[in-house]
């Protein structure tokens, strides 16, 4: 039985072997050189490929197949030789091809690149892979990229972290106003969007100080480099006007809508991006409710300039917002004009100039109704309707010099900001009491005018040097701000036929300076100790005068003339342990804080000195690209501000007249905070 089975199997094998065809040979050119080719075989008259093979290094191929066809078609093809075919009998044989060089014409070639590529700490998004129909500027495409968030104000985050730098071709042209780039650079001009994790912008610190910051860099297509691009847009329309005008429109007619005709929008954007020079100049304007000033928002500053905030607690009461989308309720006449220019004399030096001007006229209308229960049978009803017009004129100029080399860092930034803004508000206030003893308090017409100009100038210098393996950092910033503001209020009682006028003048000065040095010592590869001395000074000059208000007899002062100054000298100590994925830092600063007050009206001069200790602890653990833990704790103490040292009355608005004098010898405000973040 076993012998019969073996005999049968051998018979089937012989039949199969006899049915298999083997065709082999070589593919060569006229000179006998071997050619790379793709060789296939199919039954004659059909396109059904039975088997295929590539030639080896010697140009040899071998095809083994089985078919019942009498003849077969053998084809040899390649990009350099085109396609060559031979029809032969279906039998084992040798078949050689002698071919001539002949380019193959391809109908279509599709190359699919990766949407996201990673190279170390750099993540590159291919713009073409994320661009959708209707995406005009690069900001539209950013919203589709995973991990990147774009807020309503134009701010950008990556995996929950706010970006600290925004570059176009590795150059920071816009100095934090990157809304100008995201809203105006054409998406079709950008090749890739690079996310730079653990970004250290100071070259000399890249191998010394780890950073957890994130930056974005736009890589442009070659066609967009070194060429001047100008984009223009003009639009117009009409809407029904509401007959609105301050002082002329009857305020009792609260049904008429604010509006004007005709509508218009216009923009002209010029851009130039080259290896050593960049420029972006644009004008935008409209009265269609589009807030173009958002593009001028500065999301970060290249240097830590002093904060200038001249004291002014006065302001006009404005109509309340409707809660509807701003686009539907913003009655504006907005214009922005900005010029941003950057020169790069060499690879380490930059000279930049940024100028931004914003002009607007914003009109608002609002009304409010109040209903208070005075007793079980008595209610106090009040209603107020307001119309307002705000005029804004803001000019910002910033010039900077920056040298960022592997052996040293120097930066100097000069800023000038000036605002000449004003508010005009016209309101109608009505109130009455219901119940057993009803009373009509009549209608009061309230006119407010708040003139609020401001000027500020500051300069900031920063240099960093390496001393062996250690680092020395020096930073100095100083500035001056002046704010002469006037609030005028007129109240007309329509029932009693009387009028009252109030005028509040506030003339405020602020002089600020900040100086600090630090010396960082690196111990091994993980530990970094930093020691430094810092000094700050803030001088506030406040002169106010109130007219038209009758104060209580016990506090009859209606003016202020004083200087409130603070000085601080601190010894800073920071201890850090850091790896690429883990960081923990302890700060133990010790501050000597002095306050002085010179009140010329009260003839009061005194000062206080405090020794303050503000420890802090922070830690960060990057578990993966998308998951990290962040925790921190700090202790701080509040020691006062200019808002608590004036003894004369100031009109905050026409409803509030206040004075504030608090002894600050023993400050009692304290704060402890703990932060925890998990993403």
Q: Which residues does each PLM region occupy?
A:
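Hydrophobic h-region of N-terminal signal peptides that target proteins for export
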Residues: 10-18
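Membrane-proximal, glycine/serine-rich, low-complexity loop/turn segments characteristic
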Residues: 20, 26, 58-62, 71, ...
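Short, ordered, surface-exposed loop/turn motifs in non-cytosolic proteins
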Residues: 30-44
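A short, solvent-exposed loop/turn motif at the edges and junctions
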Residues: 41-48, 73-86
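Short, acidic Ser/Thr/Gly-rich low-complexity loop/linker segments typical of extracellular
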Residues: 46-60
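Exposed aromatic-hydrophobic patches
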Residues: 60-65, 96-98
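Conserved catalytic residues of ABC-type ATPase nucleotide-binding domains
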Residues: 100-107
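Extracellular/periplasm-exposed beta-strand and loop segments of Gram-negative cell-envelope proteins
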Residues: 319-334, 363-373, 379-398, 420-460, ...
